[in-house]
Amino acid sequence: MLTPERHQLIIDQIEKHDVVKIQELINLTNASESTIRRDLSTLEERGFLKRVHGGAAKLSDIRLEPDMLEKSSKNLHDKLKIAEKAASLLEEGDCIYLDAGTTTLHMIDFMDKTKDIVVVTNGVMHIDALIRKEISFYLLGGYVKHRTGAIIGGASLVAMDQYRFDKSFLGTNGVHTEAGFTTPDPDEALLKQKAIKQAKHAYVLADPSKFGEISFSAFAGIGDATIITTDAEELTFDNYQEKTVVKVVKP
């Protein structure tokens, strides 16, 4: 079987079954395990699939955006570990940006209010947590997305112009070596771009499920931010560590 034929067969199997095992592909193609692994690596780089332990899986819909309830209940343990690590990076007097999202929301619980930190955020859900923690903050104005509680749009971009940050902490829907960091909403991508540009240090908080995924709108290249994630048996970070810093937390 020629390589293009084999690649198409793999793509077809993933479209049909969502997840496919390496051994199943070996049986279907009569190719060696090393050949199938190379095929999966190539197809992942091209954005056709993402590799998982023992095989490959279908990518999510590039425009699909889960709501806050769905996000908050998914991979909670990983998100808490990532949030704790991110909060540990904060220093006395830091001015930071917290993106709207569940992991950045969890960060607030781990923040030390005695460090005199000032927060700028576009997260409506972050308001109560920041007030309870007695942390000084500024809320961007603009259009509020009902599904996620994120404030976006022209007004929020204009408001961002007046701020400069020591550190920005952002969520993402996709992390990919070639496509970079991506999100379903182009308006939200613009705000994330500005948050990275106006920070001395930018951090993307991503649990392992985000790796290999590509969403509709890119907001940064893979080398534009440090990644904070958790260790995962089925995932290797070698390709990412060639292009950026990856801080891996033990789950």
UniProtKB/Swiss-Prot annotation:
Keyword DNA-binding: yes
Keywords: DNA-binding, Repressor, Transcription, Transcription regulation
GO function terms (MF aspect): cis-regulatory region sequence-specific DNA binding; ligand-modulated transcription factor activity
GO biological process, one term: regulation of DNA-templated transcription
Xref: SMART domains: DeoRC, HTH_DEOR
Residue ranges the UniProt entry marks as DNA-binding: 20-39
Gene3D superfamilies: 3.40.50.1360, Winged helix-like DNA-binding domain superfamily/Winged helix DNA-binding domain
Pfam families registered for this protein in UniProt: DeoRC, HTH_DeoR
Domain HTH deoR-type: 3-58
Name the UniProt record assigns to this protein: Uncharacterized HTH-type transcriptional regulator FruR
Source organism per UniProt: Bacillus subtilis (strain 168)
